[in-house]
């Protein structure tokens, strides 16, 4: 039945102590639809879906599955009800193969041995049916992020899920992988599945969703048909105010060169060159955006500038002083700020509090420490100020960084680095995982940093972002700068040509 309701969440409330993450939220999913759950960072989307998938239990409210009231008290209970969740941060074992990860906890045996042959056969059948091409014998650590996500989807299908929850599924994907994922979702719907898509990316909602439920600060605001609202109206429902998609900025007034990179060569672990004779400069008072397909040397370039990887030849100068192959802290102390690409691995210590993370670069200096002792009153009060200024939402500065949503973790890192007032600010994927309101704010802060005379280097896979904030755009391909162009005179299509090694002047 086309209009059959498969999920009904009624007045669902979830409290963590005094903090209310979900406040009487209502959500209905119909069979065969893609229902987008739209909300800004920390709105309570993931909490609500963790309740539906059995990771959390509600404080109040009801959950009905296929017309029956259910107590979903564990992921296994959710799986038995046909509910599967594809998490934003993949739950895979790097040292295991694709097959071993998919069958983990649901192993097929033949006598006392694993029946991998039967498992592989089923995986290949599912893979072909839904357009989820994978190599069953490949190790997880050897496949791309997009491939790893396919493994997560296959895990849910292998367990018989017909209701799939996608939690911010495009946060770590390249544009090409995003397009592939949208098609995979459509394939799943054709095969009778139903999908809840947690996101704050309006273009992706336009591409696949049928209906949208908007959540703001833990409350369900409205459920609308896709065609009933413009992107502007959806953004305003999501954040509760008017939002601008294009950041206004005056023409840059670049001054002296702050960062100068000349003939840079960097080898990867297997000995081949990852960065090849790359030269680039960034001046005070400008934003240089680096555009390129993931894996073309951007990560190695940033690691070299920040002292996290060895340069084989060439030079990196800061204010005309050579900093090539210096230690990371020494580079940081020369007024370099760095927002890393991977916030979990390189940006935060998840077990530490938000306040401790904000103080990571300054804890050993006054006023954060005195006579060799940490001043926790100062550390906590400073964190509270920054959390308010940058709208980092959570129960308080004393909670662990792991308890924040992905977007709020990113805002905490950006707050820490901008607060240090660096001469050079390097920002990798500045708005990955952020909602439209937060994106608008971060873009304004980057432009403000530029206007205050800072040199800003932005690395992003989001071409709209690169075009929006940059004064010059350097396109990287195969470890080399393919071209440096102006955002005013270059289209996304032309950037795409440069990103694959083409020439736009032919």
Curated annotation (Swiss-Prot):
It comes from the Bacteria. ATP binds at residues 39-46. GO terms for molecular function: ATP binding; ATP hydrolysis activity. Keywords: ATP-binding, Cell membrane, Membrane, Nucleotide-binding, Repeat, Translocase, Transport. It is found in: Cell membrane. It is a peripheral membrane protein. Residues 7-242, 259-503 form the ABC transporter domain. Induction: Constitutively expressed. Part of an ABC transporter complex involved in the uptake of all common nucleosides. Responsible for energy coupling to the transport system. The complex is composed of two ATP-binding proteins (NupA), two transmembrane proteins (NupB and NupC) and a solute-binding protein (BmpA). This is Nucleoside import ATP-binding protein NupA. The lineage of its organism: Bacteria, Bacillati, Bacillota, Bacilli, Lactobacillales.
């Amino acid at each position: 039945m086309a209009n059959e309701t498969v999920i009904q969440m009624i007045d669902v409330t979830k409290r963590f102590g005094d903090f209310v993450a979900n406040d009487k939220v209502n959500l209905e999913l119909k069979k065969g639809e893609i229902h987008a759950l739209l909300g800004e960072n920390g709105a309570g989307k993931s909490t609500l879906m963790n309740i539906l998938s059995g990771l959390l239990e509600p404080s109040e409210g009801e959950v009905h599955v296929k017309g029956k009231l259910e107590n979903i008290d564990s992921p296994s209970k959710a799986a038995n009800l046909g509910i599967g969740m594809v998490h934003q941060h993949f739950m895979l074992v790097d040292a295991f193969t694709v097959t071993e990860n998919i069958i983990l906890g649901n192993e097929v045996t033949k006598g006392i041995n694993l029946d991998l042959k039967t498992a592989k056969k089923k995986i290949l059948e599912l893979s072909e049916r839904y357009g989820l091409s994978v190599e069953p014998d490949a190790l997880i650590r050897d496949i791309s992020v997009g491939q790893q996500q396919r493994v997560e989807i296959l895990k849910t299908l292998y367990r018989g899920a017909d209701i799939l929850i996608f939690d911010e599924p495009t946060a770590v994907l390249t544009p090409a992988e995003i397009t592939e994922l949208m098609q995979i979702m459509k394939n799943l719907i054709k095969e009778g599945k139903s999908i809840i898509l947690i996101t704050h990316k309006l273009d992706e909602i336009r591409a696949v969703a049928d209906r949208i439920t908007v959540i703001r600060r833990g409350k369900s605001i409205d459920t609308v048909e896709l065609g009933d609202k413009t992107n502007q109206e959806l953004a305003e429902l999501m954040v509760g105010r008017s939002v601008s998609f294009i950041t206004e900025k005056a023409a840059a007034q670049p001054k002296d060169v702050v960062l100068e990179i000349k003939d840079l060569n960097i080898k990867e672990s297997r000995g081949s060159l990852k960065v090849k004779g790359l030269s680039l400069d960034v001046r005070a008072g400008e934003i240089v955006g680096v555009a390129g397909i993931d894996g073309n040397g951007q990560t190695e370039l940033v690691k070299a500038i920040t002292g996290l990887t060895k340069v084989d030849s060439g030079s990196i100068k800061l204010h005309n002083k050579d900093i090539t192959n210096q230690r990371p802290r020494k580079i940081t102390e020369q007024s370099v700020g760095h927002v890393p690409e991977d916030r979990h691995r390189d940006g935060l210590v998840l077990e530490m509090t938000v306040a401790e993370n904000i103080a990571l670069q300054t804890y050993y200096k006054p006023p954060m420490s005195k006579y060799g002792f940490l001043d926790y009153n100062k550390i906590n009060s400073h964190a509270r100020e920054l959390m308010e200024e940058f709208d980092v939402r959570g129960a308080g500065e004393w909670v662990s960084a792991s308890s924040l949503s992905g977007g709020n973790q990113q805002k905490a890192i950006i707050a820490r680095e901008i607060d240090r007032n660096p001469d050079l600010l390097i920002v990798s994927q500045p708005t990955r995982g952020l909602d439209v309101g937060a994106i608008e704010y971060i873009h304004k802060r980057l432009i403000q940093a530029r206007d205050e005379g800072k040199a800003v280097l932005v690395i992003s896979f989001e071409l709209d972002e690169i075009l929006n904030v940059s004064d010059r755009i350097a396109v990287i391909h195969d470890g080399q700068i393919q071209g440096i162009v102006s955002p005013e005179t270059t289209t996304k299509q032309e950037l795409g040509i440069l990103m694959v090694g083409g020439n736009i002047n032919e």
